Amino acid sequence: MTRCIHCSRCVRFTDEIAGYQELGMSYRNNHVEVMPFIGKTVDSELSGNIIDVCPVGALTSKPFRDTVRSWELSRRKSITPHDALGSNVQVHVDKYHKVVRVLPLENETLNECWLSDRDRFSYEGLYHEERITTPKVKQDGKWVEVDWDTALTYAAKSINGVKMDHGSDAIGVLASAISTTEELHILQKMMRAVGVNNLDTRLDQQDFSGDGKLQGVPYLGSSVSDFINNKALLVVGSLLRQEQPLVMQRLRQATKNGSELHLMKKMFWLKLSLKSRSIRGRLPIPWGKF
């Protein structure tokens, strides 16, 4: 921290934006240090943004540090894959086409200039040693690596075999909900070509009784940027700090602006401003108004 100029921007970010003051200024004069509270760590889901707000580079990204020079990187615009918000990001790629850093791309209607930690650092999973990067076919009870032509031929024969024996309705396809639109389009096009129409991405949903009543996309006609202007907001069955930290940040700004926040969930772990005081803790109530 020898570069630190004690501007306290990181401290203010954790308090004013992230909502959890996990950093503070200790000691006095030229001995001042920025540090977490004794025995504590920085656990905010938005903590990576303090790297961006630091004006002198005293706070850096550990996975990226000392890997490549910034001017050697190519920059690609993209969308975050880990939430439904569609936050804009800038993916930095080195000369070997390897992703080495992900930064937020400013979009005031979505993520503003912030980014959640899971979208900032999850690129490391692309190169994890346990990630499967080549197709595998099970032979004699063991998984054997094969080329793509062999794997696709094997899959086609297996699908056609089930179709011939049991009909196309006996085949179902479940895809990840975080797949890209292009990936899902190719998958459904391929499966419909062989007569399979049972496709879905709702891996966790158990009750489908209300699907027939849905018309179009369940959209309420409001964007996250409108939260600050709403008089009241309702959150149903979601722990936003973990599931949608950027939405939670928007809700905090709305409550600071005077909006009422209503929550419907069995247990909560929140810190939301309420006039001159704050509420923080686990509240065993089915309905809360803050």
Where are these regions (language model features)?
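Short, conserved phosphate-binding/catalytic loop or strand-edge motifs used
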Residues: 21-34, 206-208
